[in-house]
Swiss-Prot record:
Segments crossing the lipid bilayer: none
UniProt keyword Transmembrane, yes or no: no
Protein keywords: Cytoplasm, Ribosome biogenesis
Domain of life: Bacteria
Family: Belongs to the RbfA family.
Classification via SUPFAM superfamilies: Ribosome-binding factor A, RbfA (SSF89919)
Descriptive protein name: Ribosome-binding factor A
Pfam family, one: RBFA
GO molecular function, one term: ribosomal small subunit binding
Organism: Chlamydia trachomatis serovar A (strain ATCC VR-571B / DSM 19440 / HAR-13)
Self-association state and partner proteins as the record states: Monomer. Binds 30S ribosomal subunits, but not 50S ribosomal subunits or 70S ribosomes.
Length: 123
C-alpha cells in the first residue's frame, strides 16, 4: 500500500516537472506554441522508465509530428526535469499520444446527425 502511494506521488511529481520543462525550456518549433497536456505519467516498477501520455490540441502540424518531436526531445526533457526532482535514477521518458478529443468529436457528430434526422421527420 505504501509503495502504491509512493508511485502515485512520484508519478505526479514527474508529471509536473515534465510539463514545466515542455512549457518553459523546450524550444523545438513543433513543440513550442502548441497546446500540449500531460494527461498522466506511469512509472515502471523498477523506476527506470516512464510512459508519458500527452494530449495535443489539433493544429496545422499533425499531432504525430508533435509527438515525434517530443520523442526526439525526450533526453533533453528528462535532463531538465531531473534538475527539479531528487531521484536516485531519473527514468527514461517514452511519450504516447492519448487522444482525448476524438470521443468528443464523435459524440458531437452523432448529435448533429440526430438533429438532422429529427428535422426531417418533424418539420
Amino acid at each position: 500500500m505504501a509503495e502504491n502511494r509512493r508511485m502515485k506521488k512520484v508519478n505526479a511529481m514527474l508529471r509536473e516537472a515534465i510539463a514545466k520543462v515542455i512549457l518553459k525550456d523546450v524550444k523545438h518549433p513543433k513543440i513550442s506554441n502548441r497546446w500540449i497536456t500531460i494527461t498522466r505519467v506511469s512509472l515502471s516498477r523498477d523506476l527506470q522508465s516512464a510512459c508519458v501520455y500527452v494530449s495535443i490540441m489539433p493544429h496545422e502540424n499533425s499531432q504525430e509530428e508533435t509527438l515525434a518531436a517530443l520523442k526526439a526531445s525526450a533526453g533533453f526533457i528528462a535532463f531538465q526535469a531531473s534538475k527539479d526532482l531528487v531521484l536516485k535514477y531519473f527514468p527514461d521518458l517514452n511519450f504516447y499520444l492519448e487522444d482525448i478529443f476524438s470521443p468528443q468529436d464523435h459524440i458531437e457528430s452523432l448529435l448533429l446527425k440526430i438533429a438532422e434526422q429529427d428535422k426531417k421527420t418533424n418539420p
